Structure formats: structure tokens, C-alpha cells
UniProtKB/Swiss-Prot annotation:
This is Polygalacturonase. Residues 516-529 are annotated as: Required for PGA export across the outer membrane and catalytic activity. Disulfide bonds: none annotated. Pfam families: Glyco_hydro_28 (PF00295). It comes from Ralstonia solanacearum. Gene3D superfamilies: Single-stranded right-handed beta-helix, Pectin lyase-like. One of its GO terms (molecular function) is polygalacturonase activity. Residues 1-21 form the signal peptide. It catalyses: (1,4-alpha-D-galacturonosyl)n+m + H2O = (1,4-alpha-D-galacturonosyl)n + (1,4-alpha-D-galacturonosyl)m. Keywords: Cell wall biogenesis/degradation, Glycosidase, Hydrolase, Secreted, Signal. The active site is at D305 (proton donor), H331. Belongs to the glycosyl hydrolase 28 family. Its main location: secreted.
Length: 529
């Protein structure tokens, strides 16, 4: 595993220096995928200089008046609109070192790349009116689930567009909104927290959203502090996200180690003045939905919800590769909960996860329920180093109590060369292995385990929840035979619970994780950890 750290360092150095690609590639189930590259200087159609100087990562002093909420939107959008296909709009520092741009919703077009240069940040407006799609409720929490906010950056039906560079996109989720009923009284993340406290639906903008289209690229950019999901692809064919960093909340809205002062977080006070990953709700990192040929490689994700959520609600999602990534706080590399149109052919390789013993931490997770279930098949996790994760392995078709007739079916799942180093704080940890058996349906979880090793105290099997049975239940285990399975002796076969075991564990050494973990701050200076 450890050869990748040299590659990561080279790639990071190349981006910081503004160099082109280092020539790395990854092997996906559908073929080789090459590292993207920065555009040549000759391919830059327009260079725009920053005019804002952030103060400690904040531009709140600039746009307290909502009339000044997006001073750079028109010139960035005009540059994109007038840029020929195959060229890039480049955002650079100003002549006096200014590094900030401030904009509302922008639209990419086919063949055009937005290049955010080293040290430059594109800040998102905190005026909900700059994102509202016509419903008039962006920046509020509603009983309706109809989405009312456009994303900061939208790529609709584009071919060959993307966002690259060693700069950053900052959604300013911890800043007070400046218009509407919540003006100057709630931050975006306070609004999101109303989902938990009042059961309302947040109407907050995402940062990057693709609709349909093909060949979309994200390369090197840091994406942080989104009011909602960071990156979502919907119905897109060919998505490459390489060397990206998702850091939420960043130091602009937190403190070192996420050690917020008592009473400063949104579960205790409104508006909050300090945020932790546990208190920035619905801030998924990378969500490919209804998409094909998706790569996330050499990337780092720290956030308040799913690191990744692979979804299939209105079309199948298939052919995905997650390679050489580092995950920190978050709710796991997840499939679901929407799986009704099917997820298939996914490989996860060389992944490290350090959950920092968060109360909401998940590792590898497939989740769904009878309202949105479908077939999830041919999923391989190979080469995983994990520590301090509350729920390391979760295969759960009873994710909620919502009823329906779209039944989950998880088949041909493989977990191999998995090594969990335990919990530094000795928190109570659990695992979930469940097939779907209800409503006269019987869809067993079929899963192969090979060299699945836990150091220290084994996580317990999860108890019953949301109408489902205690774990394991409805599971057909196969032991691959190469390496051990630490909890093999705890699996009780039974015709009553439909738990079967085929094969025997092997004796190979556990995966070496001694050099696997990388402090996030070493690659993302805005990180509190």
C-alpha cells in the first residue's frame, strides 16, 4: 500500500507549483484513467484578478449589505459564457495579493474549465436570493421537501467541463445569511440543524452540481464549508475527481481539534459561533447519483455527513472506482439510501479512514429501506485501513422505518484486506450485517470476507432497529480463505435466522497500516485536525 504516499506528495507539489499532471493513472473496472492536468497557459481565454482580501478566511465584512452579495458574479459568468470550448477561465490573485472572489450561482458550459489558482478562494454569497430557483424559500427550513436553491456552480448538460487548480471554493456555511426571514439571525448550518430539532427541510445551496452531461473533471481544488452537499453528480457519464480536498468545517468556523467552547455549537445556541463535523448537518462530500464511470482518486474528505454517498433513484449507477483516498470525520463511504434503480460494479481500493472516535462515524456502509431499495451488486472493498470509527462495517436494509415496496437486495459484496486498528477512546462500536426479510420478501445479504482483521476489542453486532432483526440475520457469509476473519467465531449459523457460512478463514498477515494515516492539516492547511 505504501507506494502511494510518494505519488501523493508529488501530485500535491505539482499542483502547488502550477505544474501539469505527473502522469499517474489508476486502473478502473472499465480501463485506465489518467490523472487530469492543468490547462496550458495558451488555453486560458480569460484571466480574472481577485479584488477582495479575506480576513482569517472570512469575507463577511464585505457583504453585510445583501446588495453587495456577489460582486464578482457577472464578470466570472461573462468570462465563462465567452470562453471557447477547450479553454479555461483562470482566477488569480490581485496585484496587491488580494485572493478572494465573491459570487452567487454560476453556470459552466461545455468544454470550459474554471481554473482557481493557488492561494485563491471563490467564496459563495450568503444571500439566499442569489440561489433561489423561483420558489422563494431558499435560506429557510420548510415542511415541503421541494428544493428551492440552485447550487453555487451548476454544470447542466455539459461535455468536457470542469473545475481545477490548487485554490478553494468556500460555501461559508457558518456565516449568517443576509436576506429573507432568517437574515442576520441564522447561519446556513443553523438552518440545516432545524431538520434535527424541528423535523423541517433545509433549503440550502449545494456547492457543485452536475445534471446529465459527460466528462466532468475536478482536479486539485479544495471544497469547504458547504451549506449543504459539496459535490453532486446527477445522470453524468464520466466523472473524474482527483486530488480534491473537502474540509468542513474549516478553521474559519471552528477551532483546532474541533474543541469548540461549551455552548457555542448549533445544538446549544442560535446563531452558533463554532461548529464541529457532528453539528454541520447534511454536508455530504461527494455524491455520484445515476452516474457511470466515476473516479474519486488521491483525495481527502472530512465532513459532517457521508464522505461519499453513491445513489440510484432515477437511473442506475454503475462502474465506480474509489482509489488511494483518505477519509476523516464523516458518515462513511456509503451506498444509498436511494438504491431503487440499482448500483453495480464498484471498486474501493487503498482507503484509509480515521473517524476520530466521532459519535456519528461510519466506515464502509450500504444503507437502504423498503421505500427506496433496489439491487446493489458486485461491490468490492480491497485494502482498507481504519481506526477510531464507531461503526466500521454497515450493511443495513433497514436504514429507516419508512414503508414501501422497493425492497433492498445486497448481493456479491466483497470485503478483503481490511484492517481496523481499534478505538483510541475505547468507544462502544458496532457492526451491522443484515439481509432484507420482511413483507414476504427474502433477499439475503451475500458477502465474502477475506483477511478482515480487528485489533483489540471486537465491535459488537448491532441490535434490532426500525423493524429489522438483530444482526447478523439473513446473511450468507463466504470466507475467502486467504486471511483471517476476526469475528468468525462470533457468527452463529442458523436456519431460523438464515445465517450460513461457506469456507474457512486463512492465516495470512493483516494489512500493514503502519504508514497509512496522514494528518489532514498536512495537506489541507484550513483543517482543524
Amino acid at each position: 500500500m505504501n507506494h502511494r504516499y510518494t505519488l501523493l506528495a508529488l501530485a500535491a507539489a505539482a499542483l502547488s507549483a502550477g505544474a501539469h499532471a505527473t502522469g499517474t493513472s489508476v486502473t478502473a473496472p472499465w480501463g485506465e484513467v489518467a490523472e487530469p492536468s492543468l490547462p496550458a497557459d495558451s488555453a486560458v481565454c480569460k484571466t480574472l484578478s481577485a479584488s477582495i482580501t479575506p480576513i482569517k478566511g472570512s469575507v463577511d465584512s464585505v457583504d453585510g449589505n445583501p446588495a453587495n452579495s456577489q460582486p464578482d458574479a457577472s464578470r466570472i459568468q461573462s468570462a465563462i459564457d465567452n470562453c471557447p470550448a477547450g479553454q479555461a477561465v483562470k482566477l488569480v490573485k490581485g496585484s496587491a495579493g488580494e485572493s478572494g472572489f465573491l459570487s452567487g450561482s454560476l453556470k459552466l458550459k461545455s468544454g470550459v474549465t474554471l481554473w482557481i489558482d493557488t492561494g485563491v478562494t471563490l467564496f459563495a454569497s450568503r444571500n439566499p436570493a442569489d440561489y433561489d430557483n423561483g420558489l422563494g424559500t431558499c435560506g429557510t427550513a420548510t415542511t415541503s421537501n421541494d428544493k428551492s436553491c440552485n447550487a453555487l456552480i451548476v454544470a447542466r448538460d455539459t461535455a468536457g467541463s470542469g473545475i481545477v487548480g490548487a485554490g478553494a471554493i468556500d460555501g461559508r456555511g457558518g456565516s449568517l445569511v443576509t436576506s429573507g426571514p432568517n437574515a442576520n439571525r441564522l447561519t446556513w448550518w443553523d438552518i440545516a440543524y432545524l431538520n434535527k430539532t424541528k423535523g423541517l427541510n433545509q433549503q440550502n445551496p449545494r456547492l457543485i452540481q452536475t445534471y446529465n452531461g459527460s466528462a466532468f473533471t475536478l482536479y486539485g481544488v479544495t471544497v469547504q464549508n458547504s451549506p449543504n452537499f459539496h459535490i453532486v453528480t446527477t445522470g453524468t457519464s464520466g466523472v473524474t475527481a482527483w486530488g480534491i480536498k473537502i474540509v468542513t468545517p474549516s478553521l474559519a468556523y471552528a477551532v483546532a481539534g474541533y474543541k469548540c467552547p461549551s455552548g457555542s455549537t448549533p445544538d446549544k445556541v442560535t446563531p452558533a459561533t463554532c461548529f464541529t463535523p457532528e453539528t454541520v448537518k447534511n454536508t455530504d462530500g461527494f455524491d455520484p447519483g445515476q452516474s457511470t464511470n466515476v473516479v474519486l482518486a488521491y483525495s481527502y474528505i472530512n465532513t459532517g455527513d457521508d464522505h461519499v454517498a453513491v445513489k440510484a433513484s432515477s437511473g442506475p449507477t454503475r462502474n465506480l472506482l474509489f482509489a488511494h483516498n483518505h477519509f476523516y470525520y464523516g458518515h462513511g463511504l456509503s451506498i444509498g439510501s436511494e438504491t431503487n434503480t440499482g448500483v453495480s460494479n464498484m471498486l474501493v481500493t487503498d482507503l484509509t479512514m480515521d473517524g476520530n472516535d466521532s459519535s456519528a462515524g461510519n466506515g464502509l456502509r450500504i444503507k437502504s429501506d423498503a421505500s427506496r431499495g433496489g439491487k446493489v451488486t458486485n461491490i468490492v472493498y480491497d485494502g482498507i485501513c481504519m481506526r477510531n470509527v464507531k461503526e466500521p462495517l454497515v450493511f443495513d436494509p433497514f436504514y429507516s422505518s419508512v414503508k414501501g415496496s422497493l425492497y433492498p437486495n445486497f448481493t456479491n459484496i466483497v470485503v478483503k484486506n481490511f484492517h481496523d486498528l481499534g478505538s483510541a477512546k475505547s468507544i462502544k462500536r458496532t457492526m451491522t450485517f443484515l439481509g432484507y426479510k420482511a413483507n414476504k420478501q427474502k433477499n439475503p445479504l451475500t458477502i465474502t470476507l477475506d483477511n478482515v482483521v480487528f485489533d483489540g476489542t471486537l465491535p459488537a453486532f448491532e441490535g434490532s432497529h426500525y423493524g429489522g432483526p438483530a444482526s447478523p440475520n439473513g446473511v450468507h457469509f463466504t470466507f475467502g480463505g486467504t486471511g483471517p476473519v476476526s469475528f468468525a467465531d462470533a457468527i452463529v449459523t442458523s436456519s431460523t435466522t438464515d445465517v450460513t457460512v461457506t469456507g474457512t478463514p486463512g492465516t495470512a498477515a493483516a494489512v500493514d497500516c503502519s504508514k497509512a494515516f496522514v494528518p489532514l492539516k498536512s495537506v489541507a492547511p484550513t483543517s482543524p485536525i
